[in-house]
Amino acid sequence: MTARHAGRQQNAWILMVGLAALVVTLVATQAQAPPKAGADFRVKAYETHLAMTRASPYKDQSWSFLGPTNVAGRIADVAVADYPAFRRLYAGSCCGGLWQSDDLGETWKPVFEHEASSAIGDVTVAPSNPDIVWVGTGETNIYRSSYAGAGVYKSTDGAKTWTHMGLADTQTIGRIVVHPTDPNVVYVAASGHEWTENEMRGVFKTTDGGKSWKKVLYENPQTGAVDLVMDPRDSNTLYAAMWQRERRKWADPRTESGFTHSGVWKSTDAGNTWKRLEGGLPPGNDLGRIGLDIAQSNPNVVYAFVDNYARGDKAPENTRNPYGVLIDYYPVGNEIYRSNDKGATWTKMSGQDDQQKLFMRNLSSSYGWVFGNTRVDPRDENTIYVLALGVSVSHDAGKTFEGMGRRGAPPPTPTPTVPAVAGQTTTAGASQAGPGVNRPVATTSPGGDNHAMWLDPKDPNFMLSGNDSGFRVSKDGGATWTRAAIPSSTFFDMAFDMDTPFRVYGSVQDHGSYRAVVDVSNGVAAMKPVAFESAPGGEGSTHAIDPTNPNIVYSAGTYGAITRSDLGAAAAAGRGRGGSTTNIRPKPETGDADELRGQWLAPMILSPHDPNTLYFGLQYLYRSKDRGQTWERLTPDISGGDKAQLGEVPYQTVISISESPMKKGLVYVGTDNGHLQVSIDEGKEWTDLTMKLPERKWIAKVLASKYQEGTVYMAQQGRYDDDFAVYLYKSTDYGKTWKSIAGNLPAGPMNMIQEDPVNPNVLYTCNDFGVYVSTNGGQKWEVLGGNLPSVNVMDFVIHPRDHVLVAATHGRGVWVFDVSKFQTK
């Protein structure tokens, strides 16, 4: 090598290092920047959304609820209001608002469906007045699909009407405690922002019914309150569980090195002062989420359900955790601690032998931050329940546990009932929806992934449970359970086939994938809710169906899995799952520096020019021209591949793909960390558009226009930065320059953008409030319809033949809207 060439190479190397440092600095600066639109903005934006709904020219056109009537969604909390003549039950949906039942869970109606957030963290009834109900919005249970709230709400008329009572920027609420005799005294445990640091976390108190609040317990911007309990005999004594955490896009929330503020605090003067309790509890740097409860029969006894991150037993060689990451040691996992002296000292009760130690370690697998609640039997201080992947009970103060739902008589035959739901009502036993419609289902299990439990202080046989499969009631001490028919399913995606009538496909959190027939032959208004049937795919999947053969179903997702199913005879027999399913995931290539990684909802599309051609996104873009039999890798790692942002949760991956319907091989690819690339020659060469983007945000949707070759749309999200501004753009020069088409949209995050399949002037988009339509290319937006609940619309499709928009909500199932009026040029 000559000196001249060496000098050039050295200069090039210096330039590369400098540019890399600049990019890292820019990304870090952007990641630390405060959100452009926080939760306070969101509350005001929702008021704008309501005003837009009232003024919408389409307010009198209704959505029809399609279902599913047989799949419920995640319940974050349960509560009971006892009236002289009856008992009222409440179920707080993670994402579908608050539901109410006056017949012990037989029928339900929504009572919190038009507020600034449909994400429920906690629901509490004032002990002194059953008409006073408090709701804390924003779920403390951190999921792939947990959403920020908008503060606390109060009802004084049994949940008929609601008033926003502040604390909007807390974003997640773990617990609300109301004074036993003075309903104006209320405490709120706020866990704070999910993704970023903030000071609106800790324990808050009001003495005037929520008109004003005082922060009475606060540690730092990373530490929030996740649980709060009050001594049943001394209302001045409270215990708070504090959790110091950070959540990153590439890692779930765990206690970081140097985090020492997680623990249990106690106040004996109604929250004015607090003292940390340490005698016997694990040190703060090992503590994760903590759940608390007090024995009502003996308030000296306090239990702490602890997620302990300390190193436990050595793992066998090549052991992987549930994320597929190699580990050397198991974490200690869940533990039960008991205090017999009101928190002065603590004794570890669980894991007394190897069998029980293993039981506790597996109780929450490796994600204890999702669970973390314990309940003490109101009559027996030694009987406790812990809520995790399952529900487990101990009758010896936590020394030994057994799983519930493994004993008891055969389940009784359920009585057919109908939920009282506006826009979602069917007749009892209605045949049009198939078996199991709107009926409670008997089971011997309390459900999986458990978050809430209520134990009747007067009747040891009556129990309520809230979990990922919905709301359940037991009237025999937990031997058998009845799953309530609350239509609150949490969909991630939506796809359609071209059969007649057509079907829609979607995946549901913690349930799997489902499909249903959409029969609009008598009009959308005449549609009835239906039960959905199982379909190919998992709980986090995207779908695509061959437009020439509705039996060929592709499903991708769950961190990069992808399959092709030929339903064949199974579909003809009315069974959505069956036939043959083939794993068609691309294989790693020799020399790959990293393992293949895909998002929770790894994107996959069929080419609009050839149904045998698929595009699939991991950290690379792949294309198959033979229905997934073979693949070619079209790009290098287009996400940037920053090693510092590679963790147990796949990140820096492709999240959206679009091929132009006008030009074969004109392909756009967007990533979760804000990279965008385009190819105009079928993937031979790529142009990086990243530095031309207005924002470096999660690219929820990139859409190549079907009307103008150079036009492309993009919806970006700030959700994972706790940012609720609108990022919606249009380019008319293949992505070189961008113009905002946010117009009068009230707030984000925007989940989707679509063109009308007939009218080039019409666009549709959606966010956490609903669906919007523009008839002038995005200059002005209107709320679509007047009766859709205020809920996160994750995805929607527009059927090109049947002129309907089908929306997949995360909390209220699937809804259908007639868009034929927009389809005249």
Explain the meaning of each model-derived region:
Residues 32-825:
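Beta-propeller blade termini and top-face loops
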Residues 9-13, 589:
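Short N-terminal leader segment in a subset of presequences, especially plant chloroplast
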Residues 14-25:
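Bacterial N-terminal signal peptides
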Residues 27-30:
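Sec/Tat signal peptide C-region and signal peptidase I cleavage site
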Residues 1-10:
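N-terminal secretory signal peptides that target proteins for export/translocation
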Residues 4-5, 19, 543:
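Absolute N-terminal positional cue centered near the fourth residue
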